[in-house]
Amino acid sequence: MRLAVGALLVCAVLGLCLAVPDKTVRWCAVSEHEATKCQSFRDHMKSVIPSDGPSVACVKKASYLDCIRAIAANEADAVTLDAGLVYDAYLAPNNLKPVVAEFYGSKEDPQTFYYAVAVVKKDSGFQMNQLRGKKSCHTGLGRSAGWNIPIGLLYCDLPEPRKPLEKAVANFFSGSCAPCADGTDFPQLCQLCPGCGCSTLNQYFGYSGAFKCLKDGAGDVAFVKHSTIFENLANKADRDQYELLCLDNTRKPVDEYKDCHLAQVPSHTVVARSMGGKEDLIWELLNQAQEHFGKDKSKEFQLFSSPHGKDLLFKDSAHGFLKVPPRMDAKMYLGYEYVTAIRNLREGTCPEATTDECKPVKWCALSHHERLKCDEWSVNSVGKIECVSAETTEDCIAKIMNGEADAMSLDGGFVYIAGKCGLVPVLAENYNKNDNCEDTPEAGYFAVAVVKKSASDLTWDNLKGKKSCHTAVGRTAGWNIPMGLLYNKINHCRFDEFFSEGCAPGSKKDSSLCKLCMGSGPNLCEPNNKEGYYGYTGAFRCLVEKGDVAFVKHQTVPQNTGGKNPDPWAKNLNEKDYELLCLDGTRKPVKEYANCHLARAPNHAVVTRKDKEACVHKILRQQQHLFGSNVTDCSGNFCLFRSETKDLLFRDDTVCLAKLHDRNTYEKYLGEEYVKAVGNLRKCSTSSLLEACTFRRP
């Protein structure tokens, strides 16, 4: 009996122990000096953190690669890496992700990235694709901004054989200064700086040295970071004598580096396992650590100081930590250009082909129905179009960002998110016939609030407590415009409390704004066609069957009434049974949308990466000539702007895809008023992708 009781007591104690979460972060150190600092870090954290708070344990390995492998094997939890090693950590089988970033500069203006740029003199007259035979200035062999990124991006232009790499680079440029290169084996790499010294004794070494090489006239182009020219030329008039080379073979002033750079390079980053990686615990630990032992916090122990070495555990120049948004994996964190450059150097692979030999455009499709239409398009395009699938629009945008997909057509709200993620609009959907459709992008369509005529007492001013129907969270007519106007009235983001219930696909599943949705099981309230109330037609159907008000485009009611939509729920509907809510509190017939709307919305637009812009433009214009609105019989032929259900890949009422001319950034395309309205609504954003992208491009 005593044994049984004892066993029960032991089990109870063990059970209690097992129930206590492991709050230890095992930090990986790569030298004796790092291990010593890690132990000091551990001991000082013990003195300031409660016993139930996070703690540090130290694991010593021989190298950063060993640390990466140890974390992947759950033998350690965290280590700080530079960008190149973050790439290694991300690769299978390691599958690590960035969780905390070091920042530099000030707390008010934290810098977590720098931009690698190509600087030239203003009067030199050549572009990025004309660098062959020019003289080049590099910060140093093997360094990110000065070598790895530019040479990685130029890799496929280098003369073959491309190994050894130094020889190929020497044969590409007519002369170079690449400090740290072997001047005996590759004399051309040291032609502009005799000796190729690997220290500041070489006047052309490092960022400032590479710029001096350009400034002195020794070289034609300097590969440096964006701040180099500002650090070396205080006078704006002097800076104006220089320009940046852009990847699209244009030039920009040196202060426009955010839109004209070779790659965005992240600061040193703490990585952890993608699954079960303790990322919240690591952040809790480091956030408390910077509060107690950050810059100018403590004399006993300093997190960003290395008395017995340099950059131990963390960079000495760091000012603090920022939490990396959860949506951001390593590929997104590093960025497409950086990953492309490093992959080219490591694997000997080549980036996008030139415009004259465009690779197929990989179109991103949402849902089963879109994929079916895309596959049909792919077959008819004879290899010009390939198809990639994703569950949500944001997943598609992420795939385009990292090169897994190339293009898709988006509502204005998602054009905004895509723009914040570095994508660009390339063609606009036009919805009205005119003689010059492809050359004249339209001003936009109208966002309207539709109600049943029978609900005669309902106005814009008494929507509180009513049942609402939205195209999806983040979309223009269905969310951004009406919720932006509503936010200005109620000054808070609790829209699920303002309406009694609704269907706004993309809302949290337990929200009242999912209660009216009709999707079954996991498809309920999903922002794709698996949710029956998704999109313009879906939101109108929601109004017909359950809701009080639907936020849609001005064409939605006419397109789904009078027998134009043969679906059972719509075939007997009449346009006259619906009215529009006007912002002045009145109502008008559906036909009077020009005088009764919430706002003018930008037309849907095709977006892509900057490097694919020319190819997407070229191929889509070819495709619409083959399969656009000039095809009259869609029963036996593929039609780009027709769908088995509704608005698949493009809006069904699209007449053509039009050139944007100078409206080729998301700000210019959407217009200042719309960008400002969506910017205000960002306070209410639940977009994890937008959070991740603004981390990269604040």
From Swiss-Prot:
Entry-annotated residues carrying Dimethylated arginine: 42
Residue ranges constituting the Transferrin-like domain according to the UniProt record: 25-347, 361-683
Primary location group: secreted
InterPro entries reported in the protein's UniProt record: Serotransferrin_mammal, Transferrin, Transferrin-like_dom, Transferrin_Fe_BS
Residues reported to bind Fe(3+) 2: 411, 445, 536, 604
Cited SUPFAM superfamilies: Periplasmic binding protein-like II
Tissue expression: Expressed by the liver and secreted in plasma.
Phosphoserine modified-residue sites: 389, 685
Keyword Ion transport: yes
Residues the entry annotates as binding hydrogencarbonate 1: 139, 143, 145-146
Residues with attached carbohydrate: 51, 630
Cellular component, GO, one term: basal plasma membrane
Binding site for Fe(3+) 1: 82, 114, 207, 268
GO MF term list: enzyme binding; ferric iron binding; ferrous iron binding; iron chaperone activity; transferrin receptor binding; transmembrane transporter binding
UniProt cross-references to PANTHER family, sorted A to Z: SEROTRANSFERRIN, TRANSFERRIN
Sequence similarity: Belongs to the transferrin family.
Name of this chain's protein: Serotransferrin
Organism, as annotated: Pan troglodytes
